[in-house]
Amino acid sequence: MMLLLAQWLQGMSSELGFLRVFQYLTMRAVLAALTALLIGLAAGSWVIGKLMALKIGQPIRGYAPQSHLSKSGTPTMGGVLILLSIALSTLLWFDLSNRFVWIVLLVTLGFGAIGWVDDWRKVVDKNPEGMRSREKYLWQSLIGLMAALYLVFCISENSNAKVLELFISWMRSGFALDLPPKAGLQLPFFKAVSYPLGVLGFVLLTYLVIVGSSNAVNLTDGLDGLAIMPVVMVGSALGVFAYVTGSAVYSRYLFFPHIPGSGELLIFCAAMAGAGLAFLWFNAHPAQVFMGDVGALALGAALGTIAIIVRQEIVLAVMGGIFVAEALSVMLQVGWFKYTRYRYGEGRRLLKMAPLHHHFEKSGWKETQVVVRFWIITMLLCLVGLSTLKLR
């Protein structure tokens, strides 16, 4: 919005040439981060007060660690503050004609809506489990598949008109259309090496990345500040990749696929970082508010969608290693318990408790130790991911 306003004002008077500074992507990214940060800090206390007035307090599951019982009643659904800050800042500073930012915004808000319903049922219906798993996955799958079907052609072509033509060609070809190399699975540490996926393969991968990332971040959000800081770190790193893939010069120099328009995602990533830091101000131990599913599901979906657009799905798994570990810990715990119950008549556990952060709590780590150590690990993993920019 500000970009269009600056361009309009420049056309009105030659004396306003200094407004050309808003054409620089990096400048708008800095302003987006600051805007989201200020919105979050300014509105945070008001949002928390409203949540408390509405008695939207976090119910604690009966099997949670004893140390968590004191958190019962802490306002949840604070993710609304994050999404509000991201949306307002992004709309203010990005190029409104950019299709990639719009799709990320829509996916983020769509998953946020799912999380909102889930949280609402928890606090209003007094059901700690919220939405039924099948219902939640149904809506997640619907949004994920819709995004995947659009992105597979959107990444392959540079305009929406050509996207429609490519879709029609795919239908007429009997669903056997070849995609350009940039739509393949990019292998890190190799120069211009990609594995062809085809349309259906791309759609399946996109669905798994978006839905998987969403639920992985949601599982990680179990301790004060645990999920939000890794989201900020990974999102910021993905912003760097977006800047590179969106630049014809840098992408060619670093042997990355050039995705015209993807650089504008740096604005969204910057806004997400600013909003995340503002939320951390209130979510740091002892937390004044929890983000809830409305925040966790949305932020995870945003990370997954951005990674798909900039073709860094594998790098996302590396940088978001904490999210991957948390999700795997739950799957392995549940799978092993069911297997041993079937095999031996008694369910057994691999971990003291899942997700993984609860295992370390049960092992004697303090909550703040788990959180900060997971932050440190994420920072190191992000550095490994960023090293793939040059180590190819």
Curated annotation (Swiss-Prot):
One GO cellular component term: plasma membrane
Compartments, record wording: Cell inner membrane
EC number: 2.7.8.13
Naturally occurring in which organism (per UniProt): Verminephrobacter eiseniae (strain EF01-2)
Protein name: Phospho-N-acetylmuramoyl-pentapeptide-transferase
UniProt KW keywords: Cell cycle, Cell division, Cell inner membrane, Cell membrane, Cell shape, Cell wall biogenesis/degradation, Magnesium, Membrane, Metal-binding, Peptidoglycan synthesis, Transferase, Transmembrane, Transmembrane helix
Pathway assigned to this chain's UniProt record: Cell wall biogenesis; peptidoglycan biosynthesis
Record family assignment: Belongs to the glycosyltransferase 4 family. MraY subfamily.
Pfam families the record matches: Glycos_transf_4 (PF00953), MraY_sig1 (PF10555)
Entry membrane topology: Multi-pass membrane protein
Single GO term (MF): UDP-N-acetylmuramoyl-L-alanyl-D-glutamyl-meso-2,6-diaminopimelyl-D-alanyl-D-alanine:undecaprenyl-phosphate transferase activity
GO biological process entries: cell division; cell wall organization; peptidoglycan biosynthetic process; regulation of cell shape
Record carries keyword tRNA processing: no
Entry cofactors: Mg(2+)
Domain of life of the source: Bacteria
HAMAP family noted in UniProt: MraY
